[in-house]
Amino acid sequence: MATLLSTERPRTGWRDYMELTKPKVVVLMLITSLVGMFLATRAGVAWSVLLFGNLGIGLCAGGAAVVNHVVDRRIDALMARTHKRPLAQGRVAPLPALAFALLLAVMGLALLLAFTNTLTAWLTLASLLGYAVLYTGFLKRATPQNIVIGGLAGAAPPLLGWVAVSGHVSAEPLLLVLIIFAWTPPHFWALAIHRKAEYEKADIPMLPVTHGEHYTALHILLYTLILLAVSLLPYAIHMSGPLYLACALALGLRFLHWAWVLYRGTRPHAAIKTFKYSIGYLFALFIALLVDHYLLLNL
C-alpha cells in the first residue's frame, strides 16, 4: 500500500493549470499592452477592444508560457526556483498541458480576430511563436545571448495593444517595444547572476555561466545606460511631456545606481535587488507614460 501511494501521480487542480500560464508575468505584459492601447488614441478606447483585446493577448501569452513549462520541465526539476512547478513535479502531464496551451492560443487569437483586427492577431501569433518555439525551443539552450535575441517576443505587448486600437504599426509603439527590448537583458541577467549555480547545474548557457559574473555585470551596466537613453526618446519625439521625462530620469538613474552597485560587487544580494527593482521600474515607467499622455490631452 505504501509503495502504491508513493508512485501515484500527485493530484492535478485548477491552480496547477493557472500556474502554468505564469500569471504574474502575463499581468505585467498586459499593463504594457493597456498603455499601448491608451497611447494610440486621443479619444477613449472601445470597451470591446479594451476587454477582449487584452484578454486575447493575455490568453496567447499564457499559452506560450505553458509551452515553456512543457519544454523546460526537466530543467525546472533541477532548479530550486522552479522545481515545484506543476510539470516538474508531475502534477500535470505534458500532453494535457500542450492541449491546454493550444486551447488558450486558439481562444486568444479568435478573440483578437473577432474584436480587434487581423494585423493584431498576426503580430500576436508571431510573438507567441517567437517565445514558445524560437526562444524556448532553441535559443535558451543554444547561446548566452538567448534573452537578447528572444527578448523581442516578450517586448511586443505595447505594440499589440497599439495596433489593436489603431489598426496599423507606427514609430511610437515600436519605440515602446525598444524600451522593453533594452530592459530585458539587465532584468534577466541580474536574476541569472543570482541563480548562476542553478543554471550551471541545468546546463543552460546563461551569460554568467559562460562568461562569468563580472562580465555579465558589465553588460548589465551597459544595457542599463542604453535603456536610460532609449527611455528618454518618447519625450524627444514629443510623444510625452515633462512629467514622463522627470519620471524616466528618476527611475532610470535609480536603475543605473543598482547596475553600478552590482558591477562594483560591494553589496551582498545586489543581483536579486537589481532584478526586483527592474520589475517595479518597468511598471512605473509605463504608468508614467499613461498619466503624462492624459495630462497632455487636458492642457
UniProtKB/Swiss-Prot annotation:
Its keywords, alphabetically, are: Cell inner membrane, Cell membrane, Heme biosynthesis, Membrane, Transferase, Transmembrane, Transmembrane helix
**EC category name:** transferase
**Membrane as a keyword?**
yes
Entry's Pfam families?
UbiA (PF01040)
Transmembrane feature ranges = 25-45, 47-67, 95-115, 119-139, 147-167, 173-193, 217-237, 243-263, 279-299
Q: What does this protein do?
A: Converts heme B (protoheme IX) to heme O by substitution of the vinyl group on carbon 2 of heme B porphyrin ring with a hydroxyethyl farnesyl side group.
For this entry, the protein name equals Protoheme IX farnesyltransferase 1
User: What is the primary gene name for this protein?
Assistant: cyoE1
